[in-house]
Design a protein with these regions (language model features):
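Conserved cytochrome P450 catalytic core segment spanning the I/J/K helices
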Residues: 1-42
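Cytochrome P450 catalytic-core helices
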Residues: 28-32, 39-63, 154-174
Length: 215
């Protein structure tokens, strides 16, 4: 690979309009902005494969059912346990005092499993989101609120598209077997992943002529 075409190289040697190189802190942030979504989507893809194994759809999915299955995967499985924020100004909420500069945590996983918001929250229901109208702070696997005015992840829609393509690929484009492995996952690890990751065997592409071994 020509290292001149790598993102890291371009960030390091990028110059502002005045000809100055970026500060090293800015370069580090931009590199992390690339790495974070790559790692995040890899985690989601692993859990999509696990969801298809643990709760396989009974038949071909409509577009709405496909989206719902991906949303339920994001709700049900642990992605990132919390987000962090610092209080800007003193305020009181439901009897709790929040002082300025206090570091606070928002429980993402707990919110996505809250029994007052979700029926049977600890059960994976692939069709849960079909015709569902969720409030902006009840379904928050990647933050809550509005993308434009809050802290909801701006790349959430792209993540959903990637996961829908993944489900379609695993269900319709290939066939495979999962050998015996440890598919359990921890609620205390960051990020959480199936213990054995997802190991596949006998992977074959579906073609018009039948099944061909994957290369």
């Amino acid at each position: 690979m020509n290292h001149y075409n790598t993102p890291f190289y371009k960030f390091i040697w990028h110059k502002d309009p005045d000809g100055s190189l970026l500060d090293k802190e800015v370069v580090a942030v931009e590199v992390l902005n690339l790495l974070r979504p790559i790692v995040a989507n890899a985690v989601w893809i692993a859990f999509i494969a696990l969801a298809l194994h643990d709760s396989p759809p009974g038949s071909a999915l409509t577009n709405e059912q496909l989206k719902s299955f991906c949303q339920e995967t994001r709700r049900f499985y642990p992605f990132f346990p919390f987000t962090v924020a610092k209080v800007r100004e003193d305020f009181t909420w439901q009897g709790y005092e929040f002082e300025k500069d206090t570091l606070t945590l928002l429980d993402l996983y707990g919110t996505n499993h809250h029994p007052e918001e979700w029926e049977d929250p600890d059960t994976f229901i692939g069709t849960r989101f079909v015709d569902s109208k969720q409030r902006p702070f009840s379904f928050i696997p990647q933050g809550g609120g509005d993308v434009d005015t809050g802290h909801r992840c701006a790349g959430e829609w792209m993540t959903l598209l990637i996961l829908q393509e993944t489900v379609d690929f695993l269900m319709n484009k290939i066939s495979y077997q999962l050998p015996e492995q440890d598919l359990s996952y921890s609620l205390t690890e960051i990020p959480s992943l199936p213990k054995s990751r997802i190991r596949m065997r006998d992977v074959r592409f579906n073609t018009s002529d039948g099944l061909n071994p994957a290369t």
